[in-house]
């Protein structure tokens, strides 16, 4: 007989220690998945990165600010073929007043006169109505010196003075009484002149 001891039994007390030390033995017919390790020096990718969002074919992602045709501006859903109701309309025959634009009209009691100057340009002057070259001075623009002036007036004997004198003679007045109408300024013609350049502007006749 040989004096060598028999080999240890595989299921003996040392078997669990070998399994814990070297890991579970590989199962025959199955291979462990290969794990890709990054090359040395490169950081590991974060573990929370998931797959890209799923996009159905033929429907791209909408751009920021794009409103689908079936959605309103406030985000409410509108079924196809639905149109928002129109806003309130004014009653039939009513038209809202538009903005008022004042036109170039003179104020009440005013009158627009056009005075020609020697250069050929037209100057528009607004004077008081009822005092346009009559028996009182008038504010206007001199057509000669082109300055804003108040006309200077002078009285001259005109046709109305002679008519009133002949009327007095016809009524049997004395020779001296028929000269009285020639002394009253209210019966004389009025001549308007420029106080600056002394130029003649207009003559107002009591009787044409």
Swiss-Prot record:
Single GO MF annotation: zinc ion binding
SMART domains, sorted: LITAF
Major subcellular site: membrane
Stretches for region Disordered: 1-71
Coiled coil: none
Lipid bilayer topology: Peripheral membrane protein
Region listing for Membrane-binding amphipathic helix, in residue ranges: 164-184
GO terms for cellular component: cytoplasmic side of late endosome membrane; cytoplasmic side of lysosomal membrane; nucleus
Localization per record: Late endosome membrane; Lysosome membrane
Induction data: Up-regulated by p53/TP53.
InterPro entries: LITAF (IPR006629), LITAF_fam (IPR037519)
Feature: compositional bias, Pro residues: 1-13, 36-67
Key words of the record: Apoptosis, Endosome, Lysosome, Membrane, Metal-binding, Zinc
Domain LITAF, first and last residues per copy: 122-206
One GO-annotated biological process of the protein: intrinsic apoptotic signaling pathway in response to DNA damage by p53 class mediator
Sequence similarity: Belongs to the CDIP1/LITAF family.
Comment block on domains: The LITAF domain is stabilized by a bound zinc ion. The LITAF domain contains an amphipathic helix that mediates interaction with lipid membranes.
Protein purpose: Acts as an important p53/TP53-apoptotic effector. Regulates TNF-alpha-mediated apoptosis in a p53/TP53-dependent manner.
Name of the protein in its database record: Cell death-inducing p53-target protein 1
Organismal lineage: Eukaryota, Metazoa, Chordata, Craniata, Vertebrata
């Amino acid at each position: 007989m040989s004096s060598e001891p028999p080999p240890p039994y595989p299921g003996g007390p040392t078997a669990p220690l070998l399994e814990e030390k070297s890991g579970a033995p590989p199962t025959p017919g199955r291979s462990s998945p290969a794990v890709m390790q990054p090359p040395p020096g490169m950081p590991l990718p974060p573990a929370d990165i998931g797959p890209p969002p799923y996009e159905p074919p033929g429907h791209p992602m909408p751009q920021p600010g794009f409103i689908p045709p079936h959605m309103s501006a406030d985000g409410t859903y509108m079924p196809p073929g639905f149109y928002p109701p129109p806003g309130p309309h004014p009653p039939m025959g009513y038209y809202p007043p538009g903005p008022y634009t004042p036109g170039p009209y003179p104020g009440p009691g005013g009158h627009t006169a056009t005075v020609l100057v020697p250069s050929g340009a037209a100057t528009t002057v607004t004077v008081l109505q009822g005092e346009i070259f009559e028996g009182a001075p008038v504010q206007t623009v001199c057509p000669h010196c082109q300055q804003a002036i108040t006309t200077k007036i002078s009285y001259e004997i005109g046709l109305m003075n002679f008519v009133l004198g002949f009327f007095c003679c016809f009524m049997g007045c004395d020779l001296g009484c028929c000269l009285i109408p020639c002394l009253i300024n209210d019966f004389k013609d009025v001549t308007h002149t420029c106080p600056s350049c002394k130029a003649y502007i207009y003559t107002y006749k009591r009787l044409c």
